[in-house]
Structures are given as C-alpha cells and as structure tokens.
C-alpha cells in the first residue's frame, strides 16, 4: 500500500513538472513570436512628419490620394514618392519580439524619449495620428533602439538612419524642373521649333545664326546638348533667403512642351548658380556644370553679326 501511494505521488509530481515545462515552453514561444511594431491601416496613411535636431520635414499626399504623389508640405513641391513609399514599407514591416527595456527610466538612456530621440516619426491619416515611432541609439551595425509612442517598451530592430534623412532637400524631387518632350525653345537670339521629327531654327535680330546655310545640321550638337540639359536638369537645393541677383549674368529660355509653357531663368552670382521657373515662386540652386552647359549651348547656336562677318572674311 505504501509502495502504491509513493508511486502515485511520484507520478503526480512528474505530471506537474511536465505541465510546468509545457506551460513555460508555450509562454516562451508566445513571448518570442514577432509582432508588428505598429498595428495600423497603412493604406490610410497620407501624412508623415520626420523630426530631428535639424527641424521637421512634413510629407503628404497631394489633393488626389490616388495619384500617389507625395509632396513637401508647406513648400508645395514634389517629393521623391518612391523614397517615401519605401520608408513607409520599412516601418510597416518592422517586427519586434522581446523588449530590451520596459520602464520609462530607460528611454533617455536608449535615446527614445521625446527630447533626445534621433528621429521622431509621426504617421497620420488626415488629422488623426495613427502612430508614432521614436528612433534612438545604435547597439550594433545597422541596428537601432526603437519605441512606439505611448509605450514604455524599447526594442532593437534592423534600421538605418540613412534611410530617414532629416533635411527637406533630402526628400525633394530633384527632377521637378526637368523639361521632357520639348517642342519649342526661345532664347535671347534664337527660336528653335520642332516640326515632326525635325527641328527648325531661326534667328532674332540683331543676331544671326552661325552656319546660316544649313543652321540645324551645323548646330545639331548644340541643339542636342541644350535639349539634353533641360531633360536632365536637377536642382540641388532650395533658397530660403533670396540673394540680390541683379548684378549676376542670366540666361532666359522660354520652353514649350505640349500644352505646357515655362520661362526658365538660369543665373550665376558670386560663384553660385540658381534656376527658377515661372510656375513656381521657389528659387533653386543647381550645379555649376549644368549652368555652363545650358549657357554655352544657347550661346553657341547664334553669333553676333560682327562675329559672322569675321568668319565670312576668314573663309
């Protein structure tokens, strides 16, 4: 009888141990199961703000959300939509498991508090804040401490600050002034018009075309260079405090593409190079090499009457 009782007790203890181990394993499995950092409806996101020590960048979808075009809010300028969408996709795919800290006192140490976070990301749908992400210090290569707004839990995730630049110009669509499918260009001394697949070139008094006998063929390289420069035009930054450009040299071109017509003003002043288009109030900087290509191409197409007379005499 005592033996049976002892065996029964031992069996009960074993069952308790097995149940405990099973419960512990299940609890560990649930704890290690990854879950999304932000459980929100990402398809409704239409505004993102990125705040750092350098300021705040606000990005929003245009009036037509279906267009998918992101803009720099406040400036009304096109942003790099692919870059914004890639960032949102990274945030959507952020998965977390076991936190490295769970109390508020750890936030400043990991730089995920409101004051010291290296990036604060606010994600909106209309006026509603869907979620906030605070990104802090790096515990290792391509890793960041991260915290969801409103939560004390701190996690480590794979994320790089290089994917979340803090400046407006980092998100600006640098090709926003590029002119594609151009069919007419008018400069100070010439008019270039596309007719079918060919171009017609004429001069404006008092200048005359170089190689006037066959102007398009003789100026083909300059024409192609000018068209290419307009198509590949890239800005490098925004000018908040506009300088006095009255003393600088300016190249003005009236450009037509289908139903769109623009006046470009390219200027050089004190070693800096600026471009502005008449459909925008913003003054942009752009590369010296691009300025020189446009200025040179537009000047090479024509020559003054005196220059042409000299060339004729030499011939």
Question: What do these predicted ranges mean?
Answer:
Residues 1-315:
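Secondary-structure "cap/kink" motif recognition
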């Amino acid at each position: 009888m005592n033996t049976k009782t002892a065996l029964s007790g031992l069996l009960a203890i074993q069952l308790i141990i097995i149940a405990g181990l099973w419960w512990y394993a299940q609890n560990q499995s649930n704890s290690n199961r990854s879950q999304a950092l932000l459980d929100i409806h990402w398809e409704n996101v239409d505004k993102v703000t990125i705040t750092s020590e350098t300021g705040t960048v606000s990005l929003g979808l245009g009036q037509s959300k279906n267009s998918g075009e992101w803009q720099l809010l406040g400036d009304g300028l096109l942003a790099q939509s692919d870059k914004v969408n890639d960032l949102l996709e990274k945030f959507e795919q952020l998965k977390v498991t076991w936190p490295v800290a769970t109390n508020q006192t750890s936030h400043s140490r990991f730089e995920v508090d409101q004051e010291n976070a290296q990036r604060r990301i606010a994600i909106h749908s209309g006026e509603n804040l869907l979620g906030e992400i605070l990104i802090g210090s790096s515990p290792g290569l391509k890793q960041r401490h991260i915290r969801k707004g409103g939560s004390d839990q701190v996690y480590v995730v794979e994320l790089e600050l290089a994917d979340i630049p803090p400046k407006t110009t980092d998100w600006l669509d640098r090709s926003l002034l590029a002119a594609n499918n151009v069919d007419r260009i008018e400069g100070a001394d010439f008019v270039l018009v596309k007719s079918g697949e060919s171009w017609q070139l004429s001069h404006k008094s008092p200048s005359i075309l170089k190689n006037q006998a066959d102007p398009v063929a003789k100026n083909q390289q300059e024409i192609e260079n000018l068209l290419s420069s307009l198509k590949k035009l890239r800005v490098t930054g925004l000018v908040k405090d506009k300088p006095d450009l009255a003393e600088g040299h300016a190249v003005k071109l009236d450009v037509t593409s289908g139903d769109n017509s623009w006046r470009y003003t390219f200027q050089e002043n004190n070693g800096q190079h600026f471009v502005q288009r008449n459909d925008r109030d913003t003054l942009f900087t752009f590369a010296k090499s691009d300025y020189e290509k446009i200025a040179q191409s537009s000047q090479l197409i024509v020559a003054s009457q005196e220059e042409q007379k000299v060339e004729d005499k030499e011939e």
